[in-house]
């Protein structure tokens, strides 16, 4: 699926921070991860918790934005909030530095579209190397960023061992990312077509779909 990359990405997502903290608590440092069991030891409890939380709002409506999304919007918001965003970014960078000193990192205080993509590819490349995956093509998901797409730098998707990464994207309308100027790679409906002996082919099955038909109604916040 791709969730193993949460142990390596430098983007301070909720999953990455939780994985870093749990790894410290379990004395399971990321640099020692060498097999699936090492990843599952840290990530299985985390994703069990996330799954249980998602099940609470299982009525088909999307949940209100969480803390990580609100923080991302504040830090990568519109130009009219430039001064506020600059002040927040300074505090954010200090917070990231503190987390790195505490051993939760390595993390970077960079939330641009390019960095979100590159960080995921670096992290997935690390997973492939540590698991010893011997394949020409590695198909993954989790980050919801479809690719490689026309216009992407193919070198970013190529691994040192010769494999090529391919992200199937998602089937979730990520209103936060799709609303950004660089949001098209996050458009839902990604798929990878495979056949015997052929090259995997990336498909965009919902291109041109009406956004109103893809967006779930907002669920009320729970007390």
Predicted regions mapped to residue ranges:
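Extended recognition/assembly regions associated with phosphoester-bond processing machinery
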Residues: 2-223
């Amino acid at each position: 699926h791709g969730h193993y990359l949460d142990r390596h990405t430098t983007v301070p997502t909720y999953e990455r921070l939780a994985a870093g903290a749990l790894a410290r608590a379990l004395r399971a440092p990321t640099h020692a991860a060498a097999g699936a069991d090492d990843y599952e030891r840290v990530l299985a409890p985390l994703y069990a918790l996330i799954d249980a939380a998602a099940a609470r709002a299982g009525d088909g409506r999307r949940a209100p934005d969480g803390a990580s999304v609100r923080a991302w919007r504040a830090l990568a918001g519109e130009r009219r909030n430039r001064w506020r965003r600059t002040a927040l970014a300074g505090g954010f960078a200090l917070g990231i530095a503190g987390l790195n000193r505490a051993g939760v990192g390595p993390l970077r205080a960079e939330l641009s579209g390019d960095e979100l993509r590159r960080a995921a590819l670096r992290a997935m490349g690390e997973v492939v190397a540590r698991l010893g995956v011997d394949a020409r093509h590695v198909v993954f998901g989790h980050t919801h960023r479809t690719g490689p797409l026309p216009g992407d730098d193919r070198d970013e998707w190529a691994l040192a061992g010769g494999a090529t990464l391919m992200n199937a994207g998602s089937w979730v309308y990520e209103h936060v990312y799709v609303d950004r100027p660089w949001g098209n790679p996050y458009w839902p409906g990604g798929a990878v077509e495979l056949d015997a002996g052929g090259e995997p082919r990336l498909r965009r099955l919902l291109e041109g779909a009406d956004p109103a038909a893809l967006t779930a109604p907002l669920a009320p916040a729970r007390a």
